[in-house]
């Protein structure tokens, strides 16, 4: 504050003819910038057209490049009397503010240099110029999976695009958290750079993942094991079909023999009836004796058959109850090696599950 008051007094005391103080002279070694900032009027500048820079970096770039149009010219105020010092100071302050607010004049050399550095990408058919000349903003071409697929030519993804163009079937090996899951054979429709695929008309051969304790004991699945298991299942199915056909034929034969036995029983009943009719002509005394003998024989037979039937039914009941208890104790056996096949109209396979892709033979 003392320096400020001292600078103000010295400026008021000085006459227009007297030389400026060395502390307010810009070209002097004893120049005091703080005192010049708090002075009531601007100190005289030896070069009135000197450019004004915003910071030191801008000044360094000016020294390196030699550009002269970046700065703003600042004029020097004429010395005024002590009475008109306040008016001149306010006028100089307003003019400096207006100059600071004004935009800097563009440098034509710099603009030409930037234009030379710009690279214009023109299309082969010359449509870029027509787009720029046309009114309004030009529409960008759509960018999606279908437009990016042809850009992978000359790479493994380019071979996938060739399979799409030519309609070649592909085999896609997919995996689970442990190893191989199965093989999908179908026609490729779309893909992306992450190997996500969409297929149609797919035949899948797969095995369900092994869980529980069998996961630790089970060996990793391979293609040979997968298809060998499938062949084994097909052969076992054929054997089961042949066995079922043989059983059907034996059942049909058994049904025919049972019908023949029933017919023979019916024939015996008819013969018994005819013999009964003939026995009516026999005397009553002979008929009574024959009836008593037949009754005694029938009673003996029934007692034997009842005992045997009771024992047989009891033994059968015990065996059935034991068999049922055993069946309840037994757990259903799960075949973890079973291979399944199915047909899918369309399927999406994530790229993280793809192991291998090759052409179907």
Curated annotation (Swiss-Prot):
Annotated Low complexity bias: 76-96
Cellular compartment(s): Nucleus
Modified sites of kind Omega-N-methylarginine: 41
One GO MF term: U7 snRNA binding
Annotated stretches, region: Disordered: 1-26, 67-142, 268-335
Region described as SM 1: spans on this chain: 172-205
Residue ranges constituting the Sm domain according to the UniProt record: 155-230
Phosphoserine, modified sites: 15, 21, 155, 281
Entry keyword Cell membrane: no
UniProtKB keywords: Isopeptide bond, Methylation, mRNA processing, Nucleus, Phosphoprotein, Repeat, Ribonucleoprotein, RNA-binding, Ubl conjugation
Post-translational modifications: Not methylated.
Matching InterPro entries: Lsm11 (IPR039267), Lsm11_M (IPR034109), LSM_dom_sf (IPR010920), Sm (IPR047575), Sm_dom_euk/arc (IPR001163)
GO cellular component: histone pre-mRNA 3'end processing complex; nuclear body; nucleus; telomerase holoenzyme complex; U7 snRNP
GO biological process, any: regulation of chromatin organization
CDD domains: LSm11_M
Highest rank taxon of the organism: Eukaryota
Region annotation SM 2: where it falls in the sequence: 344-357
Domain notes: The C-terminal SM 1 domain is both necessary for the binding to the Sm-binding site of U7 snRNA and U7 snRNP assembly. The N-terminal domain is essential for histone pre-mRNA cleavage. Amino acids 63-82 are sufficient to interact with ZNF473.
Function summary: Component of the U7 snRNP complex that is involved in the histone 3'-end pre-mRNA processing. Increases U7 snRNA levels but not histone 3'-end pre-mRNA processing activity, when overexpressed. Required for cell cycle progression from G1 to S phases. Binds specifically to the Sm-binding site of U7 snRNA.
Similarity section: Belongs to the snRNP Sm proteins family.
UniProt cross-references to PANTHER family, sorted A to Z: U7 SNRNA-ASSOCIATED SM-LIKE PROTEIN LSM11
The name this protein goes by in its record: U7 snRNA-associated Sm-like protein LSm11
Classification of source organism: Eukaryota, Metazoa, Chordata, Craniata, Vertebrata
Gene behind the chain: Lsm11
């Amino acid at each position: 504050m003392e320096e400020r008051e001292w600078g103000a007094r010295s400026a008021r005391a000085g006459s227009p003819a007297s030389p400026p103080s060395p502390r307010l002279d810009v070209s002097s070694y004893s120049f005091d910038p703080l005192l010049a900032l708090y002075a009531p009027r601007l100190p005289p500048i030896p070069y009135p057209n000197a450019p004004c820079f915003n910071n030191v970096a801008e000044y360094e770039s000016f020294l390196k490049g030699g550009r002269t149009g970046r700065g703003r010219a600042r004029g020097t105020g004429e010395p005024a009397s002590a009475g008109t010092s306040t008016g001149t100071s306010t006028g100089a302050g307003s003019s400096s503010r207006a100059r600071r607010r004004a935009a800097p004049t563009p440098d034509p050399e710099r603009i030409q240099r930037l234009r030379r550095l710009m690279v214009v990408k023109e299309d082969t058919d010359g449509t870029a110029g027509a787009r720029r000349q046309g009114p309004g903003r030009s529409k960008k071409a759509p960018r999606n999976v279908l437009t990016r697929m042809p850009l992978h030519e000359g790479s493994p993804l380019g071979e996938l695009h060739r399979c799409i163009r030519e309609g070649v079937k592909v085999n896609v090996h997919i995996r689970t958290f442990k190893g191989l899951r199965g093989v999908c054979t179908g026609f490729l429709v779309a893909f992306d750079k992450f190997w996500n695929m969409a297929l149609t008309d797919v035949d899948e051969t797969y095995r369900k993942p092994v869980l529980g304790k069998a996961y630790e004991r089970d060996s990793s699945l391979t293609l040979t094991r997968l298809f060998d298991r499938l062949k084994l299942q097909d052969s076992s199915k054929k054997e089961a079909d042949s066995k079922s056909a043989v059983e059907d034929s034996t059942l049909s034969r058994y049904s025919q023999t049972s019908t023949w036995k029933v017919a023979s029983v019916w024939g015996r009943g008819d013969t018994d009836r005819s013999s009964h009719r003939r026995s009516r002509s026999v005397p009553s005394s002979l008929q009574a004796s024959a009836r008593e003998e037949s009754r005694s024989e029938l009673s003996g037979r029934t007692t034997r058959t009842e005992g045997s039937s009771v024992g047989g039914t009891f033994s059968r009941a015990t065996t059935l109850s034991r068999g049922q208890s055993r069946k309840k104790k037994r757990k259903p056996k799960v075949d973890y090696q079973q291979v399944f096949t199915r047909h899918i109209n369309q399927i999406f396979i994530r790229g993280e599950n793809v192991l291998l892709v090759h052409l179907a033979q």
